[in-house]
């Protein structure tokens, strides 16, 4: 999970900081609000922590291909357990997230199998989608944690502490499933079927 902490989370910080600039309009672009400084600081994180592509290559090579995807599939198995808990819930939000999580996990496993099969025999194919693989995995793992949080938020103990806060947690998890996890199958397609187009241009085309 180290590449996700260093690569995925720092890429997400850029998106968040960019939205911070955007919602301030023109004021966000100048220095008065401080938003522009946050944006610059977020950008350097994707370099200081080892560039995103380096972290993605580590995820493909040392974290996935080296053991034939066994470590990755171990995480997928843990995610499947959370799926089952969500699906068994009486909450419609939990059941909806379970479906999204299942589709994302299955897409992830397909990518893991693709990388394991091509890591040594066709490394260009395996590494061509390394950054999308990093982002796909990050989206999945974050969705898994959102699912776990949703399950906690539904418990009587949590509801007794702060019902409004817990309701917001449930809604946020549902939103994540509908708007973020739903992207994962498409990311899978670009990784397993898009390698050839990454390397298609000959050198003299540059």
What do these predicted ranges mean?
Residues 66, 81-206:
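C-terminal amphipathic alpha-helical interaction region
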Residues 1-74, 174-201:
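Alpha-helix capping/hinge segments and adjacent helical runs
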